[in-house]
Amino acid sequence: MSDENQHGFYRTSFEYASISWRRMIPNVADTIVVTLIGATALQVASNVLITILTLNIAFLNFCSLICMHNLKRGAKADVFAAIVRAACMMIGVYLALIAVSVATLEGAPRTQTIAFIALSALRPFVAGWNAYCAEVFFAQGKRQIVRSVITRSSLIYAGVNLLFVGLSHFAGTQNSIISLLIGVYLALFHNALAYARILPTEWRFSRQDLKDVFSLRKLDLVGIGAGLSASFINMLEMGFLALVGWVVAAKFPQIAVFYFPFFTLVELTSGLAIGLGRSVTERLITPRPFPRLHVLIAVYSTYSLLCFLIYVGLIGVSNRDIFALPLSLAGLALLFLICDGLQLVVRGYTLAKADGGKLTHLSAIAYLASGVILALAAVLGSVQALAIALVLGPLFLAISIPAVQSRTALNALPNR
C-alpha cells in the first residue's frame, strides 16, 4: 500500500472519528438528562426511554449502510424509499410500545411515557433525511461539511436540554416532556435545513422525485442484510450494557463508581474504532486499498492503552484505587476497552458485504453467552463473573469475525 493511500486512509478515519466524538456530545447530555429525570421525578419509564434511544441508533446505522452500498450506484429514489419505509416501521414499534405502556403502567408514569413516545414519532423521518444528506457528502469526500453541521447541532442539543432540565431542577419544578424534546428537534431540524440548503442539485428531491419514491414497489438495493446486521448488533450491545448497568447498580454498588465513568472512556475510545471500521467498509465497497488488519489492530490497541492510562491517572487523582478491586478489574477493563474497539474495526469487513456476512449469528452467540454469565453473576454476587460477562461478548467478536472470514476476503485489497 502506497504512503499516499495509507495517509489518505488514516486521514479519512480520523475525520470520521472526529465526527463520532462530536456526536457523543448529545450522549453525554442524555446521560445527565436521564440522571436529572430521576432527580426531578419526571416519570418516563426507563425501559421505554432506553428502547427508543437504542432504536434511534440502530435506525441510523441501517440508513448509513444502505446509503454506503447504494448511493454510488445512483439509486437515489430506492435509497430514500428504503429510509422512509424503515422510519414507518419505527412508528409501528412506537405503537407497540404505547400498547405495552397502556397495559403495564398506571397513573402519571403511563401518561408521561405515552406522551414521550408520541412526541418522538417525527424523529425517525427527520433523522432519516439527515442521514441521507450526510452520506451524500461523505460519498463526495466533503466530510468537513458534516463535521461542521453536527458540531453545531450537538451543541444546540446539549445546551437546550441542559438549560431546560437545569432550570427545572434548580427551580424545584417538574420537567415537561416537551422541554426534554425541544433540544432534540431543534438539533434535528437545524441539520435538516442546513443540509437541504447546500445539498447538490442532483441529490435533491423534486415533487416528481417524491412521487417516484412513494410509487416504488420493489426496491433495487444491495446491502439490506448489512444494514439489518448493523442494527441488530447495536440493539444487542445497548440492551446488554443497559442490563449490566442495572445489575451493577443493584448488586455491586462498590464498583458502580468505577463502572459508569468507565463507559464515558469507552465512548471516547470507540470513536476512533468507528472511524477505522467505516473507512475499511468504504474502501472495500469502492474498492480502494487500506492497511492490513494487524496494522489496524496495533494502531487502535496503542490508542486504547494511552486512553486507559489517562483514565487510571484520573482515578488516582480522585484518591480511588482501581487496582484494589477483585481480580484486578483494571486489567479486565483494559481488555474490554481494546476488544470492544477491535470488534468495531473488524466489523467493517463484514458490513462491506451486501448480506453483512455472519455478523448477526456471531453477535447472537456472543451476547447470549454473556447474558447467561451475567445472570449467574447477579445470582452469585460474583464480581469476577460480572467482569467475564462484560468482556466475553467483545472478545468473542474480535476473535471470531476475522476467523470466519476467508484470508482472501480480509486481504483482498491491500497491496502485496
Swiss-Prot record:
Task: Identify the main location.
Answer: membrane
Keywords, sorted A to Z:
Cell membrane, Membrane, Transmembrane, Transmembrane helix
Q: List the disulfide bonds.
A: none
Q: How does it sit in the membrane?
A: Multi-pass membrane protein
Q: Which domain of life is it from?
A: Bacteria
Q: Which residues cross the membrane?
A: 24-44, 48-68, 79-99, 114-134, 153-173, 176-196, 230-250, 255-275, 295-315, 322-342, 372-392
**Subcellular location, record wording:** Cell membrane
Q: Which GO terms describe its cellular component?
A: plasma membrane
Function of the molecule: The actions of the proteins TfxB, TfxD and TfxF are implicated in the processing of the inactive trifolitoxin (TfxA) precursor into the active peptide.
Put simply, this protein is called: Trifolitoxin-processing protein TfxD
Which gene is this protein's source?
tfxD
